[in-house]
């Protein structure tokens, strides 16, 4: 699979990453920079969640120490750990959606657009396995309805509808096909995260099979270049 250039953790600013790396102190923010401090807290939280892969293992004290502020300063912006984690995940999700849209824009072919979205998601999970687990496998995910995640399914359904409208896939219930496809793709990437030592085939080969068997697109003849085989442009 072609490598896609992604940041070390989605939504982590360079200043926050440096603060996390050195664990040093931080001067008082000038007046009017409360939003900047909030962004730094979210960035460090995303980095720590990606490392820990567990929202329950995150402490606000650790976040404050990494940012270089007093723990009480975190509470100015977030009522508790759940509120902080939810805000961080929502920002990460928003950044991911923007990157998926950019990947889709790399081709005008509707099947290529759908494939590009799925491949980018797979690459993102590889580089953000901890965040993926918190988003989909954490106790917070079980206890809380993360409404922002619904957008990912809606965008996938819209991409499938475009394939059907262009005659590239059989006319069907796009929402049902989307659910089947998302279940298959999330299963493939989740199993790679949780069972990395299994002899996995290249993810793009699995995705191509999903597109043929679940969406109904035409398979790519061996040896023939295809518009579907479009690699998302770097972000």
Indicate where each model-derived feature is located:
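N-terminal intrinsically disordered/low-complexity leader segments
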Residues: 1-36, 221-235
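Hydrophobic alpha-helical segments that form the core
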Residues: 2-18, 172-194, 202-213
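Generic hydrophobic, amphipathic alpha-helix propensity
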Residues: 37-45, 63, 88-92, 96, ...
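Helix-turn-helix
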Residues: 40, 48-83, 87
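Alpha-helical DNA-contacting segments of helix-turn-helix folds
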Residues: 85-92, 135, 152
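Hydrophobic alpha-helical connector segments
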Residues: 101-130, 181, 224, 228-230
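Short secondary-structure transition hinges
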Residues: 126-158, 194-197
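Amphipathic alpha-helical packing segments from all-alpha helical-bundle domains
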Residues: 141-166, 175-179, 205-212
């Amino acid at each position: 699979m072609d490598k896609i250039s992604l940041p070390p953790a989605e939504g982590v600013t360079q200043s926050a990453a440096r603060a996390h790396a050195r664990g040093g102190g931080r001067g008082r923010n000038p007046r009017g920079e409360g939003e900047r401090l909030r962004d730094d807290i979210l960035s460090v939280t995303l980095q720590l969640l990606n490392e820990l892969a567990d929202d329950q293992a995150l402490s606000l004290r650790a976040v404050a120490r990494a940012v270089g502020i007093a723990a009480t300063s975190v509470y100015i912006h977030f009522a508790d750990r759940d509120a902080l984690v939810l805000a961080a995940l929502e920002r990460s999700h928003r950044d991911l959606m923007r990157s998926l849209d950019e990947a889709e824009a790399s081709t005008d072919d509707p099947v290529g657009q759908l494939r590009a979205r799925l491949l980018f998601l797979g690459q993102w999970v590889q580089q953000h396995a901890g965040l993926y687990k918190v988003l989909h496998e954490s106790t917070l995910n079980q206890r809380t309805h993360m409404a922002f995640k619904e957008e990912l399914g809606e965008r996938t359904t819209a991409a499938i509808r475009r394939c059907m409208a262009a005659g590239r896939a059989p006319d069907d219930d796009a929402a049902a096909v989307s659910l089947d496809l998302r279940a298959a793709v999330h299963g493939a990437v989740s199993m790679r995260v949780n069972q990395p030592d299994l002899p996995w085939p290249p993810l793009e080969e699995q995705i191509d099979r999903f597109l043929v068997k679940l969406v109904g697109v035409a398979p790519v003849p061996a040896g023939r270049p295809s518009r579907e085989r479009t690699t998302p442009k770097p972000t």
